[in-house]
Amino acid sequence: MSFSLNFTLPSNTTSSPVVTSAKATDCGPSIGLAAGIPSLLATALLVALLFTLIQRRRTIDDEPVEETEIPCEISELYDNPKISENPRRSPTHEMNPRGSQEGHIYVKTVSGSEEPLPDTYRPPEELERRRGLWWLVPSLSLE
């Protein structure tokens, strides 16, 4: 199946098509205005959003620092059982063998001694040294 259009023009006209049977109704600027309303609305909403974001940032920047930051006493750090960094260790960041920086975090236990917190994001070194597809086999232990 093929579809073709064949326009024939009278010899005395230019390249504008001739309307013969339908009424020539001009919709005028109403269609153009209706088509432009969604884009105008979207532009207005975008401007309103930017204005509110700028106003919020200005109000946050105008607040004094003393109201937003609460100073913490040193005694509160030592009395708090939460995680705290060991102040006696001078280099807080060391380079590991792979070249990335590593921070040391210590946990103060109930007995008062400080132990390093195990890194839960990185697997232990012995698991990284395994080769091949042995990591697919589940490790069974009786412990």
From Swiss-Prot:
Residues 79-95 are annotated as: Required for plasma membrane localization. It is found in: Cell membrane. The chain crosses the membrane at residues 31-51. Its main location: membrane. Glycans are attached at residues 6, 12, 14. Signal peptide: none annotated. GO terms for cellular component: cell-cell contact zone; Golgi apparatus; plasma membrane. Residues 85-96 have a biased composition (Basic and acidic residues). It comes from the Eukaryota. InterPro entries: Opalin (IPR026609). Induction: By leukemia inhibitory factor (LIF) and cAMP analogs. Suppressed in the presence of astrocytic or neural-stem-like differentiation factors such as bone morphotic protein (BMP) and fetal calf serum. PANTHER family: OPALIN (PTHR21102:SF0). This is Opalin. It comes from Mus musculus. The lineage of its organism: Eukaryota, Metazoa, Chordata, Craniata, Vertebrata. The gene is Opalin.
